[in-house]
């Protein structure tokens, strides 16, 4: 069996707080294979970005506690890796595309210098070779006048251009995994589509695995091979993207999809999931979604496991899986 690029198993993480520990991740398991584009979906506070930052080991030291679980990157232990090893991995094995490129790029340095620094940090090549590679990467991202862009500062580029630069940077050292944390949220819809197409094309051409984090099921449906849905720090459904979107089993996934506006239907009243997300400091016993769930029953007083509930290895953490059919 082929070794997965990323393998997360039964991860539990909390942050200390004045009113008790905040249980940000609860028994999270996730796998990504070479060349696969996987979506991680959920509303704000569900644990998506915490998962991404932990994979990169970018959470401040001492600010969190991993109670149990493991993260393996190409078979190597991420959680116990030393800082020197992490510096070698970041960029070369795993890279990240952040939501807001203006805060990710250095505003005081020209684009070309930033790209060349990253390339030469991981590859023993000359400045001339690094410059040529940077220009090639920018041209692959369909950036016009790539040579001119090399001499510009981030603030001189549009949001879409900056995000293309970030994608080029992420691929610059040919990592096996790229984590894209809502990279198109701040972009116009037309620019968003262009950036997604570039990301997908480059990932397919290079065989790079991608973990794509989003709250938008429509975006995920265009890009991802499979999807994991998170709620209150837990994965509550996973499977092939088409199966999860058109045949969701978990009531939360169904609610998430029904909240999306339909194209061509003007002034519709959107349905909403009743109630609020539970306090992660004091999670309820049993299923975290049961107080908001229309299908809740007596079994929901116990925590459900993520088990098979459909075709193509679709799984959901629900005692009463649904048979909903959604048109998206």
UniProtKB/Swiss-Prot annotation:
ATP binds at residues 42-49. Part of the ABC transporter complex DdpABCDF, which is probably involved in D,D-dipeptide transport. Probably responsible for energy coupling to the transport system. It is found in: Cell inner membrane. InterPro entries: AAA+_ATPase, ABC_Ni/Peptide_Import, ABC_transporter-like_ATP-bd, ABC_transporter-like_CS, Oligopep_ABC_C, P-loop_NTPase. Keywords: ATP-binding, Cell inner membrane, Cell membrane, Membrane, Nucleotide-binding, Peptide transport, Protein transport, Transport. NCBIfam families: oligo_HPY (TIGR01727). PROSITE patterns: ABC_TRANSPORTER_1, ABC_TRANSPORTER_2. The lineage of its organism: Bacteria, Pseudomonadati, Pseudomonadota, Gammaproteobacteria, Enterobacterales. GO terms for biological process: dipeptide transport; protein transport. It comes from Escherichia coli (strain K12). Its main location: membrane. The complex is composed of two ATP-binding proteins (DdpD and DdpF), two transmembrane proteins (DdpB and DdpC) and a solute-binding protein (DdpA). Residues 6-257 form the ABC transporter domain. It comes from the Bacteria. It holds the Pfam family oligo_HPY. This is Probable D,D-dipeptide transport ATP-binding protein DdpD. The gene is ddpD. It is a peripheral membrane protein.
């Amino acid at each position: 069996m082929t070794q997965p690029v990323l393998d997360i198993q039964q991860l539990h993480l909390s942050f200390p707080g004045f009113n008790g520990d905040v249980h940000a991740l609860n028994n999270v398991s996730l796998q990504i294979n070479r060349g696969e584009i996987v979506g991680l979906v959920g509303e704000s506070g569900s644990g998506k970005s915490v998962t991404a930052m932990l994979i990169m080991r970018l959470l401040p030291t001492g600010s969190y506690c991993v109670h149990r679980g493991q993260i393996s990157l190409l078979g190597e232990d991420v959680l116990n890796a030393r800082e020197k090893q992490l510096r070698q991995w970041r960029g070369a094995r795993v890279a990240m595309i952040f939501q807001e490129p203006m805060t990710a790029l250095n505003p005081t340095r020209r684009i070309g210098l930033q790209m060349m620094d990253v390339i030469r940090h991981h590859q023993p090549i000359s400045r001339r070779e690094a410059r040529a590679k940077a220009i090639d990467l920018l041209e692959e991202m369909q950036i016009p006048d790539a040579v001119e862009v090399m001499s510009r500062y981030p603030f001189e580029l549009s949001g879409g251009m900056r995000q293309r630069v970030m994608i080029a940077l992420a691929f610059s050292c040919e990592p096996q995994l790229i984590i894209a944390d809502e990279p198109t949220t701040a972009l116009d819809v037309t620019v968003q589509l262009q950036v997604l197409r570039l990301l997908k094309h480059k990932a397919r051409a290079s065989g790079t695995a991608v973990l794509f984090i989003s709250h938008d099921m429509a975006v995920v449906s265009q890009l991802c091979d499979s999807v994991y849905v998170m709620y209150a720090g837990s994965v509550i459904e996973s499977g092939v993207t088409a199966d999860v979107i058109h045949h969701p089993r978990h009531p939360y996934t169904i609610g998430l999809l029904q909240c999306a506006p339909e194209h061509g239907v003007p002034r519709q009243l959107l349905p909403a999931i009743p109630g609020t997300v539970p306090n992660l400091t004091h999670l309820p016993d049993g299923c975290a979604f049961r107080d908001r769930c229309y299908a809740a029953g007596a079994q929901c007083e116990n925590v459900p496991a993520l088990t098979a509930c459909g075709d193509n290895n679709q799984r959901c953490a629900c005692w009463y899986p649904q048979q909903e059919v959604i048109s998206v």
